[in-house]
């Protein structure tokens, strides 16, 4: 019998390794800066939300769920002053190709050969309620560059997973800050690094801790076993 849970865990880790590095890639940040954006401000938020950003800041804030509204407003407003979201997407994609060729050249040909199958998988997913996925699915697929196209397909699938994740959090009445605290504990990160990195301030953190405590997930100021099991 197929162990779908194990396969899903493997796929999750593989997709994270294939996609996640681009969010902090020096080449991507440099190319984004060269578009005129001061110090590459907001590279992560702008390039990840580019297919959705023309719908407006509030739409991106709603879709991203765990990132503070003021962070998103700053990043997208600065980007609009200096470039377009299409250009931000283009240079991010340039960095993807450069990075794959530099860091993992051994996978380039085989990954590229999977592009059509990966897009078939992406297209097969249910679209309802999956906003970021839908936006990425609708943008150019760069079929003329197979490895980039394959990467974009995996990214699209990964955003579908993210949309699903946020829907589950919302259904459980877990805020973005609370989710960050639970995930910090699960990963063994110190303190409140994840919600802080997404813009949470002291007041928001205090509120989140209080809510988690009331749900029985906190002991002595730390997420307890019940909280970890819930997460």
Question: Where are the model-predicted features located?
Answer:
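Phosphate/adenylate-binding glycine loop and adjacent helical scaffold
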Residues: 1-206
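Accessory, usually C-terminal, subdomains that scaffold auxiliary metal cofactors
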Residues: 198-231
